[in-house]
């Protein structure tokens, strides 16, 4: 196989692993939301905040990606009229350093951050 073919396969593997993390099928992945985003979306009660988090999770699972994000590791979406950014970062299994190989789930932990553009 050519180097280009190998690169495409690697990119698609990373994209599929990112999809699994976004859709809740990767038990090692973490999903975090910035306090600014939760403050803007959530209400004054714990119940309202939990409902805002549920809406964010639904948007995360169904977001679409621009062609310039082949690994599906960055997206912009709208939740309740608020622009929300989604970014996937790749860490080692201890969450201390960057992963040496994001295509290898045995050595990579994904952290998905949901934030406002101002938080980026």
Go through each PLM region and give its residues.
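Compact soluble domain cores
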Residues: 4-78
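Short, compact, well-ordered microdomains
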Residues: 73-120
